[in-house]
Amino acid sequence: MDLEISQIAYHVSDIRTACKNMYLQFAAGPFIISENIELANGEHRGKKTQFVHSSAYGQWGNIMLELVKQEDNSVNTPFREMYGPDEEGIHHTAVMVENFDKAVAHFDSFNMPLLTRCTTAKAHVDFGFIDARKKLGYMIEIYERSTTLLDFYQLVKNRAKEWDQKHLFFSV
């Protein structure tokens, strides 16, 4: 099973400030910000969840960087599972998989269970969080490889290659 890390994600308290800091400290960027991402459906620890989050996506060397903030007060979420609203730190790495259920079974066989499964409302992206905290200290996000996701990753990578470092944020 190909489980190459495609993204590293940090929970942050202020997305734009975090983007600026990642640029200044590590030359990461530029960033596209998706605000108030809603879910079509979601389940966390076997219970329905409808958290709202915002994410900034940028390039950090050869890997995508996500800076994520939960925007609502939901408590049953993969973000509140690890961090309070003002706390920051690594939340997950992400891998694209060929088959979601097979990936879940693979991780489960190593005592890393599926904690969260959701579908975004607008883009209809299915994703899940594997609880790898006992083994790695953070979660693993999984989603099935798709043209939509591959195109988005390529867009972010291309923007980084063409970046003149005059503008930290870009839109699509």
Language-model segments: which ranges?
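Intrinsic, low-complexity N-terminal interaction/targeting segments
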Residues: 39, 79, 114-120, 124-129
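N-terminal beta-loop-helix "entrance" segment that forms/cooperates
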Residues: 39-46
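Glyoxalase I/VOC metalloenzyme domain signal
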Residues: 1-6, 10-32, 47-113, 131-172
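Short linear motifs in intrinsically disordered
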Residues: 46-48, 118-119
